[in-house]
Curated annotation (Swiss-Prot):
InterPro entries: TM_pro_TauE-like. It comes from Arabidopsis thaliana. This is Sulfite exporter TauE/SafE family protein 6. It is a multi-pass membrane protein. GO terms for biological process: protein ubiquitination. The keyword Transport applies. Belongs to the 4-toluene sulfonate uptake permease (TSUP) (TC 2.A.102) family. Keywords: Membrane, Transmembrane, Transmembrane helix, Transport.
């Protein structure tokens, strides 16, 4: 009996030793895999440092990035959500271009899509664009973008990534909510159309197309200015971060204030007779008018920090302020065209590299956006399910959020483990 007991104890000891050895082997294997992953990511990040200065050559990765950008522009234009969120991740993760170079490429691609949007919106819906509101919002919005770009240089990368992920998650929720609203409205409109004659149904259908098109069309496309304070010299003689540069940058403050005050005065004088003489209504109207520059500055500030523009930010704020959805979307699209165009010109002035490739991507996104708009006008109303595309874009934004969050956490761990400075930095 004692012999069996001793033998049983020995067998348990052998199993315990084998289990411990196997656990150690698994831990070593997991640690080795983790180190290999970190090494590959670090090697990839190192290879991106000089990509903005190197000349881009035609490669499979660049072709895949072009196809993905074309698809993103087409789907986003068809849904009316916009595609500014997808360009930078595609160019950074697929084409292997660093974030600053990807931002400059995104500016040109947004410009191409904005041209298609302007042709479709401006010439077809002139009465929906509130030019006084655009003049009121644009100066403070551009000023906010300039301040946001400086914050982008000062803030650490992990903070910008975290803020961007939070904002992207909020935008995804807004997109899905808009898709749900579009779904319910399409059902209601479908029931009403069945009860009317064919002529009234056709009129209602066209109005519905215009409503959804201007409610969701490219309200977040605008300039991305992350390389505004770059080190390279452009075709201008003023060096970035020099005394002349800061003086020129500071001049935006009085100019923005002057144009905003003039726009406020003009708007008040034009609408003075249309406002009720009641004091409460007058004060409420003045409060909303004063809030518009503040909201546009906030939109430009966040847009400059994230490098994706402020269209997606200013549009919900205008809707909450009581501006009709059609006027909000059309006016924002009108503002975005000039902002995106100016952004591309500024990148050229600051010595942007690989301009030929940026032109090609801009043309690609122009045709993709045009096809997306045609699809939204001709195909989507036939099936009466525009909300499906909106849900699709919302899902894509959720996936982009997960990828950006995972990559940001991994990069933060690598930089912290390597002992790099992860705090705030000087703008120059």
């Amino acid at each position: 009996m004692k012999t069996l007991f001793v033998l049983f104890i020995l067998i348990l000891c052998v199993f315990a030793i084998n289990a411990n050895q196997q656990e150690e082997i698994n831990q070593e294997s997991t640690q080795q895999t983790h180190q290999n992953l970190l090494y590959k990511v670090q090697k990839w990040r190192t290879s991106l440092k000089d990509s903005s200065d190197a000349e881009l050559k035609l490669s499979p990765a660049l072709v895949v990035a072009g196809v993905l950008c074309f698809t993103a522009a087409l789907i986003s234009s068809a849904s009316g959500i916009g595609d500014g969120f997808f360009f930078i991740p595609i160019m950074n993760l697929v084409a292997g271009i660093d974030l600053k170079a990807a931002s400059s490429f995104s500016a040109f691609m947004v410009t191409g899509g904005s041209i298609a949007n302007l042709i479709n919106n401006h010439f077809g819906c002139k009465k929906l664009i509130d030019y006084d509101l655009a003049l009121l919002l644009e100066p403070c919005m551009l000023l906010g973008v300039s301040v946001g770009v400086i914050c982008n240089k000062v803030f650490p990368e992990w903070l910008i990534t975290g803020l961007f992920v939070v904002f992207l998650m909020w935008s995804s929720m807004e997109t899905c909510e808009n898709g749900h609203t579009s779904w319910k409205l399409s059902l209601i409109l479908r029931e009403k159309e069945d009860m009317r004659d064919s002529r009234l149904a056709e009129v209602k259908r066209r109005r519905t197309i215009i409503f959804f098109k201007h409610l969701y069309l490219k309200i977040k496309k605008t300039e991305t200015k992350q390389s505004f304070l770059g080190r390279n010299l452009g075709i201008i003689s003023i060096k970035p971060c020099s005394v002349e540069y800061w003086i020129l940058l500071s001049l935006q403050i009085p100019l923005a204030l002057v144009f905003t005050i003039l726009a406020l005065s003009r708007t008040e004088s034009l609408q003075e007779q249309s406002i009720s003489n009641q004091e409460g209504t007058r004060l409420d109207h003045q409060f909303k008018r004063l809030m518009f520059p503040v909201m546009s500055f906030l939109a430009g500030l966040l847009g400059g920090i994230f490098g994706i523009g402020g269209g997606m930010i200013i549009s919900p704020l205008l809707l909450r302020a009581g501006i009709p959805p059609q006027v909000t979307a059309a006016t924002t699209s009108f503002m975005v065209f000039f902002s995106a165009t100016m952004s591309g010109v500024q990148y050229l002035l600051l010595g942007m590299q690989n301009t030929e490739a940026a032109y090609v991507f801009s043309v690609i996104c122009f045709f993709a956006s045009t096809l997306g708009l045609v699809f939204a006008q001709k195909v989507v109303p036939h099936f009466r399910r525009a909300s499906i595309i909106v849900f699709l874009v919302g899902t894509m934004m959720y996936l982009t959020t997960i990828v950006m969050a995972s990559f940001g956490i991994l990069v933060f761990y690598i930089d912290n483990d390597a002992g790099k400075d992860i705090g705030f930095q000087l703008p120059c």
